[in-house]
């Protein structure tokens, strides 16, 4: 897998083409991704680059984290993320170095990963797009109920994986094949066509598209 960047979702807006067409876009803030560790096959069993970004109050950094960041010679960030890498990805990448928004270029296709918005406990109609039952005709309390879950006497049980009410959202989601509309290295901004997972202010991971 190729190296990506960790950024913060700023929100959505739109841009116009020269022909006047409106394109919905999401703006992602890319602060410098500081390299905290370079893993190799001999020591770790696989190749990867570990990065951090942003800042975190000193009181919120554990002693182990302080030592890890100090060893890399970088300021403590709001988390650590890891990207699997091959030999070509590791060229010129050293501990303490930075990866900036210019990792991507205009027109490139990317995959964006984030945590979807949490919706809490939801019923089958909202969570799984089930149809509602009759509003009248003798139905008094089961308008949004999911109905039978265990079939008949045979099998007489609820199969694993049955779609039922429960926690909705707040899951790791990846949207593939989004186009980079523009890259602003000076201000650390990526403008990506379409919507990406998560709420405004949430962390997102931007990688080169696996299907490009």
From Swiss-Prot:
Species of provenance: Psychrobacter cryohalolentis (strain ATCC BAA-1226 / DSM 17306 / VKM B-2378 / K5)
Q: What does this protein do?
A: One of the primary rRNA binding proteins, it binds directly near the 3'-end of the 23S rRNA, where it nucleates assembly of the 50S subunit.
Note the subunit structure. Part of the 50S ribosomal subunit. Forms a cluster with proteins L14 and L19.
Keyword annotations for this protein? Methylation, Ribonucleoprotein, Ribosomal protein, RNA-binding, rRNA-binding
- Name of the coding gene: rplC
Give the CC-aspect GO terms: cytosolic large ribosomal subunit
Q: Which Gene3D superfamilies match?
A: 3.30.160.810, Translation factors (2.40.30.10)
The record's Gene Ontology biological-process terms are: translation
Composition bias type Polar residues, residue spans: 140-155
Q: Which domain of life is it from?
A: Bacteria
Mind telling me which HAMAP family this protein's record contains? Ribosomal_uL3_B
By what name is this protein known? Large ribosomal subunit protein uL3
Write the lineage as a comma-separated list: Bacteria, Pseudomonadati, Pseudomonadota, Gammaproteobacteria, Moraxellales
């Amino acid at each position: 897998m190729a190296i990506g960047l960790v950024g913060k979702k700023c929100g959505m807006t739109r841009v116009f083409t020269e022909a006047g067409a409106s394109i919905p876009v999401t703006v992602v803030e890319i602060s410098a991704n500081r390299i905290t560790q370079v893993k190799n096959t001999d020591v770790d069993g696989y190749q990867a680059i570990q990065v951090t970004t942003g800042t975190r109050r000193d009181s919120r950094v554990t002693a182990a984290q302080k030592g890890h960041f100090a060893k890399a010679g970088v300021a403590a960030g709001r988390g650590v993320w890891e990207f699997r890498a091959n030999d070509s990805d590791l060229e010129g990448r050293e501990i303490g170095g930075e990866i900036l928004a210019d990792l991507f270029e205009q027109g490139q296709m990317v995959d964006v990963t984030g945590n979807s918005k949490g919706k809490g406990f939801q019923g089958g109609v909202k969570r799984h797009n089930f149809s509602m039952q009759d509003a009248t005709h003798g139905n008094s309390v089961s308008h949004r109920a999911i109905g039978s879950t265990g079939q008949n006497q045979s099998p007489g049980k609820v199969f694993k994986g049955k779609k039922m009410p429960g926690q909705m959202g707040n899951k790791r989601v990846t949207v593939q094949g989004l186009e980079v509309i523009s890259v602003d290295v000076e201000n650390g901004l990526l403008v990506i066509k379409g919507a990406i997972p998560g709420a405004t202010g949430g962390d997102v991971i931007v990688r080169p598209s696996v299907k490009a």
